[in-house]
Amino acid sequence: MEQEFFYKDEKAKLIPLCRSLLRYGREAVANSDFARLKAVVKAGAEAGAYHRDRFGLNPVLRNMSAAELLCERLGSDRNMIVAVMLYNLNRHGFLSRETILKEWGADVAKIVDGLNKVSTLYSRHSLVGSENFRNLLLTFAEDIRVIILMIVDRLALMRAINHHPNQQYVNDVAYEVSYLYAPLAHRLGLYGIKSELEDLSLKYTNREVFTQIAHKLNETKASRDAYIADFIKPVKAKLEQEGLKFEIKGRTKSISSIWNKMKKQKNDIENIYDLFAIRIILDVPKEREKNECWLAYSIVTDMYRPNPSRLKDWLSIPKSNGYESLHITVYGPENKWVEVQIRSKRMDVIAEKGLAAHWKYKGDRKSTRLNSSHSHASRMPASA
C-alpha cells in the first residue's frame, strides 16, 4: 500500500491489527484467502479507491477493526470477514459485483449486496431512529449477517472516536448508537455488544456521569467482590452436593444500565440494590437442561428468599431472539436483593452471541435470512 495512505499513528496500528485478525480468523479463513485479501486491499489503496469517512478515519483500519470484533465477540466467519473487507471497494466502483461473485463466491456477493442496500436506505432517511426505519432496515437487509456487520462496524467506530476533536460529530454518532444500533443489538440478542455501545454512548454524551459511576464502582470493588464470594459459597457447595457440573460467577452490571436504574428509581448509586448479578452456568446435555436449571433454582431459593414478582422464566418461553434463561431476585446476606441468572452452557453461548449462534453453531445457513420472528423482535422494547 502507498505509505501516504496511512498516517504515522495508523501504521503503528496496522501490524497488530493484522496479527490479531489472522489469529482470530484462522479457523474460518484460509491463508490463501488472507493473502488475496491483502493484495486486493493494497491495490484498492494504491488506486485511491478508499475514502476517509467524515471523521477522517482510515477505512481499511475501520474494516479490519470490525472484522476483528466480529471474530472476537461472535466467532470467525469467512464470508463475513471477506465481505466487510471488500464492501468499500465495491461501493466505490473499484471491485465489481461480478468479480466478487467469481473470485469470492455467491455468499460474499450476497452480503456485500445487503450492505449496499442498507447504506443506500440509510443515506435517504433522516429519521433513522424511528421504529419505521428499523423495520425498513431489517426488510432491506434480508440477511441477518448484514445487520450484524453494521452493528460491529459501529462498535469499531465508537471505540475509534474516543479522542476525536470534533465533539459535535462524536455526539451525533453516540446519539445514533443509542436510538438505532444498541436497540438493534438488543433485538438480535447481542447483549454484550449492546452494553458496550450504550456505555460508550453515555461516556461521550455525559462524560461526568459516566466517570462518577465508574469511579464509584472502582471504589467499592473489593467489598462487592467479597459479598459475591460470600453469596456464592453455600450455593456452590449445595450444587456440588447434588452432583451438578457448573460454573458460577458474579458480574457487575454495565455503567449505562446502572445509570438507567438510578434515573428510574430516582436514587444515587449507593441505594441501587442490584449493581451486580450472579450467573450459574450448567454443563448439561440439552435434554436435561430445563430439569437441572429448575433444580438449581430450587437450591438457590431454598437458601435465599425469592421475590416472586421478579421471576423471569425464559426457559418455558424463550425470547424471540433465542435467549433462554431463568432470572430470579433473592434476598441475600446483609438484607440485599441479588439477581441470579440460571442457564446451560448452550444457552450461555446464545446469550453471548445472540441469533448469530443459531446459524454459526448449528450450521443452519438458511437461518441467516431475516424472517417473521426477527420482524417480531424488531417490535420488542429496547430493554429487557
How would you describe each model-predicted region?
Residues 1-27, 39, 46-53, 62-64, ...:
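Nucleic-acid processing machinery
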Residues 368-372, 384:
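Conserved small/polar residues in nucleotide/adenosyl-binding loops
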Residues 375-377:
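Short hydrophobic alpha-helical segments enriched in small aliphatic residues
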Residues 85-114, 190:
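Hydrophobic or amphipathic alpha-helical targeting/insertion segments
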Residues 61, 76-86, 107-111, 145-146, ...:
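Alpha-helical scaffolds flanking conserved acidic
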Residues 24-40, 97-107:
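Short, mixed-charge amphipathic alpha-helical segments
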